[in-house]
Amino acid sequence: MTKTIILIPSRLGASRLPNKPLLKIKNKSLINHVYEKGKSTNIGQVYVATGDQEIFDEVVNNNGKSILTLKEHLTGTDRIFEAFEQLNLKNIDYIINLQGDEPLIDVDDIINLNNLAIKNNSEIATLACKLKDKYIDNLNVVKVICNGNIEKNKISSAQNFLRSIKKKN
């Protein structure tokens, strides 16, 4: 039987919306909404990986699991890697990178991602969708460059994540 862990990178240092993970939505922090979505999949253990004591405390004080990482990580992927190494869990086959700022994510999408990761033997997976033209120049939207088209129920390898795209002349 395969084992999956869901790791949720989260930090307070966002310049566009400071303290975003701790903002309340219907009396619950954004990060706890995301954590609960991960837990409700029942596909494996869920941890929030953070370099901020405030986020760690928020999750743990609401009966969640969190792990403190270095604050200096440049990407969520780096934070997840450190958290996974610190946890030192045995027999984990797959890691789901669940974005910490997606409180409205559909639980079925997370489950489907896990199933696709297992089917394709992809050790780490994160969700992405086709980008609408109106978001191409929006620096608030992270873009992913893949080795193929992004389609529903299809897996594609991420080559890079970026906020701005250099346009060809």
Residue ranges and their predicted role:
Residues N27, T69-K71, G100, C146, ...:
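Active-site donor-binding loop signature of nucleotide-sugar glycosyltransferases
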Residues D106-N169:
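Conserved core of the sugar-phosphate nucleotidyltransferase
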Residues I43, L89-I92, K119-E123:
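Short, high-confidence coil segments that cap the C-terminus of an alpha-helix
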Residues Y47, Q53-N115:
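Short phosphate-binding loop-to-helix
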Residues T2-T50:
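N-terminal glycine-rich phosphate-binding loop and ensuing alpha1 helix
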Residues P9, N97-Q99, L127-A128, L162:
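Short beta-strand segments
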